[in-house]
Amino acid sequence: MLVPLAKLSCPAYQCFHALKIKKNYLPLCATRWSSTSTVPRITTHYTIYPRDKDKRWEGVNMERFAEGADVVIVGAGPAGLSAAVRLKQLAAAHEKDIRVCLVEKAAQIGAHTLSGACLDPGAFKELFPDWKEKGAPLNTPVTEDRFGILTEKYRIPVPILPGLPMNNHGNYIVRLGHLVSWMGEQAEALGVEVYPGYAAAEVLFHDDGSVKGIATNDVGIQKDGAPKATFERGLELHAKVTIFAEGCHGHLAKQLYKKFDLRANCEPQTYGIGLKELWVIDEKNWKPGRVDHTVGWPLDRHTYGGSFLYHLNEGEPLVALGLVVGLDYQNPYLSPFREFQRWKHHPSIRPTLEGGKRIAYGARALNEGGFQSIPKLTFPGGLLIGCSPGFMNVPKIKGTHTAMKSGILAAESIFNQLTSENLQSKTMGLHVTEYEDNLKNSWVWKELYSVRNIRPSCHGVLGVYGGMIYTGIFYWILRGMEPWTLKHKGSDFERLKPAKDCTPIEYPKPDGQISFDLLSSVALSGTNHEHDQPAHLTLRDDSIPVNRNLSIYDGPEQRFCPAGVYEFVPVEQGDGFRLQINAQNCVHCKTCDIKDPSQNINWVVPEGGGGPAYNGM
């Protein structure tokens, strides 16, 4: 059940918006209106308030059942499933018995998967050379490839020359959730133990500091943090090697970065938020196999982003469309969701949708840092693959093929080490250094290196258009071999400017036909969580959202969240506001954890199975 967004009925708040008080006065007003003698408790999660200090937990049995495996994989996306499949393929070919366990927080494989998606099939075909015979859902080869620059009223076509990264010749338009579901079936047929609905909540360590495995999350905890009568401790899964394939900005990967200092020699990751819808359209507007990409309006030149519109051949006139907004944007008044809704009204987009019906909505963060932001990938007992470390080719607008290849290479490296007659390890958890070496010698590394300067080239005075000029000159001539590497501008959360330095953005109201409100959109994601559990959007300090984020940045979390999770509502007594977290609405996009200017929000897993229920997104 979704939580409806509260109506901000506070007279002071309404007065501010009605009179459009000058932006220079906002921090002063916000601080005064937010003044309150006590800060209401928001966070009740045990990661913030440890249970060993809570009397309500005295006498509760906290023992966990443990299982052992050779390899444990966290996350059933393209990378995790590729690793699982390749491991079992190798085990069968060499008649080896290797136990592979894969845990996935979604209730069904593919239910948390969201992507455009236009697939470069190279790695997929390598993994499944007989994919046609097995009925893989690659139904829509690209037949037409278009790119354009949008102004408010016009579309300026740009030719896609052979060799440029955005060329889609030979690619397929896919519903990635369906493809992942099919891969899950292949993995199980090979003997992989797949456990959907089990969220990996904790990294376990040996006494020597190497990774021992993971623990799934506890269930049966009340919203206030007390144990229910149905409380059950999570399961421990121990392994010789644990593969972390959580996807973009994984919460366990965050811990591993700190534990093993994996980002010591790379730049901070930079991200985008991708918002997507599926529509059934009028058949006369349907062009199966057409791929459309644009940059420009509704975003300004200093806000990185772009759109996609893909015509699928799935037995009905179906299109997938979306907008990606770089999370290094500076204006706290920007709402990626409302920019997406506005984009659909462009004269080159709206005619495709008129007379159609929207059937699905979702959102997910994606990595945009590229080559410069790749961390160290291996550590004692584990390794990172896929979108967790970030192998997306940004100008190509693709990361599934590189994620799959990283999973394949990880599996081959692990298999070699597990089956080596001279297996030796300085730590209890195996350190598979061969994986990183093999990746650096693969086409993945070469591909990402060749486009390393395109995303940071958009930070110049010309913004996105400067990046296009750079691509046209240097990539076209030098193919990424220029003797320099551009840098990013720091972490995304650092880029946000105070509200007083920015202009509020006036968004048009949704018309209910082409554009829609937030709550009706989230309803189409199938999102659901157990209501009586602690919010998994935790705050390190409950006072910061009002005292800092609202005061200085006008509460950007109420805009950057694409699911209406965060609201500033009037306090029940006295003047001021408090932050309300509608955790049930969360679509697990991770944007809040990334963009919060105070880095106060920490996303952790809810009870397993909760979250969106995407169907082929």
Swiss-Prot record:
Pfam families: ETFQO_UQ-bd, Fer4_ETF_QO, NAD_binding_8
Record's keyword terms, sorted: 4Fe-4S, Acetylation, Electron transport, FAD, Flavoprotein, Iron, Iron-sulfur, Membrane, Metal-binding, Mitochondrion, Mitochondrion inner membrane, Oxidoreductase, Phosphoprotein, Transit peptide, Transport, Ubiquinone
Cystine residue pairs: none
Chemical reaction(s) catalysed: a ubiquinone + reduced [electron-transfer flavoprotein] = a ubiquinol + oxidized [electron-transfer flavoprotein] + H(+)
One GO molecular-function entry: metal ion binding
Assigned EC number: 1.5.5.1
Subcellular location: Mitochondrion inner membrane
Entry GO CC: mitochondrial inner membrane
Coiled coil: none
Enzyme superclass (EC): oxidoreductase
The UniProt record lists the keyword Electron transport: yes
Cofactor(s) in the UniProt record: [4Fe-4S] cluster; FAD
Binding locations of a ubiquinone: 305-306
Positions of [4Fe-4S] cluster binding: 561, 586, 589, 592
Modified residues (N6-acetyllysine): 96, 132, 223, 357
Matching InterPro entries: 4Fe4S_Fe-S-bd, ETF-QO, ETF-QO/FixC_UQ-bd, ETF-QO/FixX_C, FAD/NAD-bd_sf
PROSITE patterns for this protein: 4FE4S_FER_2
Positions bound to FAD: 71-85
Chain ranges inside the bilayer that never cross it: 109-130, 428-447
Cofactor binding: number and manner: Binds 1 [4Fe-4S] cluster.
Domain 4Fe-4S ferredoxin-type stretches: 577-606
Family (UniProt): Belongs to the ETF-QO/FixC family.
Annotated function: Accepts electrons from ETF and reduces ubiquinone.
Subunit relationships: Monomer.
Protein name: Electron transfer flavoprotein-ubiquinone oxidoreductase, mitochondrial
Annotated organism of origin: Pongo abelii
